[in-house]
Amino acid sequence: MAARNWSRVWVGGTVILISFIAFSSQIFVIWPWYGREISLDLLKLLVPLNLAAFMIFWNYRLCVITSPGSVPEGWRPNIGAMDGMEVKKGTHTPRYCKNCEHYKPPRAHHCRQCKTCWLKLDHHCPWIGNCVGFYNQGHFIRFLLWVDIGTTFHLIIMVRRVLYIAEYYHQEPTLADVLFLVFNFATCVPVWLCVGMFSIYHVYLACGNSTTIEGWEKDKVATLIRRGKIKEVKYPYNIGIYKNIKSVLGPNPFLWLWPQKMQGDGLSFPVNPSAGDHTTQYFWPPQDPSRLPNPPPIPAHASPFVYGNNGFNPNLQPTNSLRARRSSTPHIDEDEHSHERDQYRHYSSGEERDNDSISTSSSPKPYLSDYDHYDEGPMYPGERMTALIPRVRRGSEGWEVAPGGGWNAYSGMMDEEVGWDDEVGYDEAPGEGPYVERPWEMRGRYNVYDTEEESGYAH
């Protein structure tokens, strides 16, 4: 109930703001300027201004009262049509809403404000007290564009009035003229700037047949591809600028600014053939395999060494041990330290155990940077063992250049200069005082099997 009341406040405030800008300028600025008499010049100003105001109110009303489109009761994805589709297990699954307890059609999302799932949800807009979705997205974009047109024309009239006062300064304006000029500039300029930028953004989304939420999804998918978590995929709904705009504003370009009903049911959408067949839409966006309940296992037989022609082994599975250990084993003592080293002693640098608690799986495609790592903040003492987990470096698999004495001396000087804690440094040599390891200065971050020293630790 409280949310509904606040929604009415937002809508009422928006109506008052539009009315003030549209009518106060006509009554207190334009009408006195033309001597309070009907003339052709006056009509040239009032007719376009009132037409823009009418279209703003009309589209705003449609935005408020038009439902974005709810998910039909009992709707389920056409699983039978997906049998012939090759789908990567675990990273592509039909979408399901736990709050509403039903499957979600393509592009549908759950709104926490409305507490329901809407078709092709873009965002929840407090200014209209409604969500922007499939059935009212066109009304919303038209509303923004008409606000741009109306405020631009309004500002042109106000600027002309100011220039007239400056040119005919002997005709002193009344106090009401000055006050309402100031008020109109103070209200119209911020609206023109804010709505203008918002309009540019939503027109850009319409040209790409995307929504605000899908823009975030595409950024997330691009990050997963760059880190090698998933294979490269294409956004399936971009079918060309002209067709994209037609799908939102209607088939006739001459009526794009005229209110019209959205075509389609919002349950399925045309798909770009280069992205796959029509079933591709049921599996967008692909999920992060490392966040699934049962992530795919890591093959123990995979070798990291390069193939011929400067190619990499397609079975190579770089891991991110730091994130996996933080989520599963927050603290490791010295006994576990020695156990981990024994665990990996008989494995070469490219062989990794099939153990989900140690590492997460990622794709070996060429979208990784030099290191598959995440910037998660400082390394804490309980995470020192993460340096011993095998990690893969592109172009130099199985090799490590250990830092020499010059680096140790230089790093000691830098520690004193920047004031690092004893918790992560060598204050004194072993046996002479506090001794804590530096993970980045430890040998053996790549474990190599040594046949001559089978009883010793891996280097």
Swiss-Prot record:
Gene Ontology biological process terms from the UniProt entry: protein targeting to membrane
DHHC domain ranges (all copies): 95-145
Keywords in alphabetical order: Acyltransferase, Endoplasmic reticulum, Lipoprotein, Membrane, Palmitate, Transferase, Transmembrane, Transmembrane helix
Signal peptide bounds: none
Record membrane topology: Multi-pass membrane protein
Reaction(s) catalysed by this chain's protein: L-cysteinyl-[protein] + hexadecanoyl-CoA = S-hexadecanoyl-L-cysteinyl-[protein] + CoA
Residue segments, region Disordered: 278-379
Membrane-spanning intervals of the chain: 10-30, 38-58, 139-159, 178-198
GO cellular component: endoplasmic reticulum; endoplasmic reticulum membrane; Golgi apparatus
Compartments reported by the entry: Endoplasmic reticulum membrane
Record PROSITE patterns: DHHC
Protein family per UniProt: Belongs to the DHHC palmitoyltransferase family. PFA4 subfamily.
UniProt remark on domains: The DHHC domain is required for palmitoyltransferase activity.
The protein, known as: Palmitoyltransferase PFA4
Species lineage: Eukaryota, Fungi, Dikarya, Basidiomycota, Agaricomycotina
